[in-house]
Amino acid sequence: MMRILLFLATNLAVVLIASITLSLFGFNGFMAANGVDLNLNQLLVFCAVFGFAGSLFSLFISKWMAKMSTSTQVITQPRTRHEQWLLQTVEQLSREAGIKMPEVGIFPAYEANAFATGWNKNDALVAVSQGMLERFSYDEVKAVLAHEIGHVANGDMVTLALVQGVVNTFVMFFARIIGNFVDKVIFKNEGGRGIAYFVATIFAEVVLGFLASAITMWFSRKREFRADEAGARLAGTGAMIAALQHLRSEQGLPVHMPDSLTAFGINGGIKQGMARLFMSHPPLEERIDALRRRG
């Protein structure tokens, strides 16, 4: 809860600073001089409310959505030795990480992957793919589980949701400024908001949202290094490196993780060139090198 309060306070400060900065640079006067009557303070508050509402709502239903989108079966009563081992391992790792035991599940996928999600570190879900259980050693799976437990213990799901809330706020804010400017200045519409406003706003939201996702993905990549460190601490550096090397050997396999969960999986796929800016995970080679330097 303290993390949420501090982050919300920080984001409120960002909104206020943005409002003051725009006023100091005479942006209000510029818009008024061009016939655009827009209260930027009210617009910022409006965008912040809706920007954070969408992000936090997604966070609160993340466990339910993850189970539905991946067909994850939560283990309540273990039926096999794999399931028994999974429960015991997650319980041990959770205890060592200082969090409550999350729900544990298996999702039907040939690819080697795992994810963690949940709105609270003491009310989370950790799931692993059937393919990973079949092809990875117990030490490697334990390292992957430790990585996911690291995400939970670090509060990464909450942090990323709040970062997305900030991004949503400013995408909505600047898209509406652009929409008003196009409508009033370029199309000279003086009576209410015309079609140009709505078209320009939607177009700007799509473009700005795409560009701003690079910011969210940058935060996501930073989280992965921290989760790898947690995995190494809980399961051993050698096991964590071995798990990442095994993942690297299977990079040719398609990743079928839903887009909404890609940032929370251990395997984010491969991208080249400028597309690397929009990767949720650093390249596996970089993650392995970071662990080796850590020792």
Curated annotation (Swiss-Prot):
Segments traversing the membrane: 4-24, 42-62, 158-178, 195-215
UniProt xrefs under Pfam families: Peptidase_M48
Places the protein is found: Cell inner membrane
Active site, UniProt feature: 148
Its EC number(s): 3.4.24.-
Entry's cofactor comment: Binds 1 zinc ion per subunit.
Class in the EC hierarchy, top level: hydrolase
Cofactor: Zn(2+)
Membrane topology reported for the UniProt record: Multi-pass membrane protein
One annotated Gene Ontology cellular component of this protein: plasma membrane
Any one biological process term the GO annotation gives: proteolysis
CDD domains hit by this protein: M48B_HtpX_like
GO molecular function, one term: zinc ion binding
Highest taxon of source: Bacteria
Keywords: Cell inner membrane, Cell membrane, Hydrolase, Membrane, Metal-binding, Metalloprotease, Protease, Stress response, Transmembrane, Transmembrane helix, Zinc
Entries under HAMAP family matching the protein: Pept_M48_protease_HtpX
Family: Belongs to the peptidase M48B family.
Protein name according to UniProt: Protease HtpX
Native species: Pseudomonas fluorescens (strain SBW25)
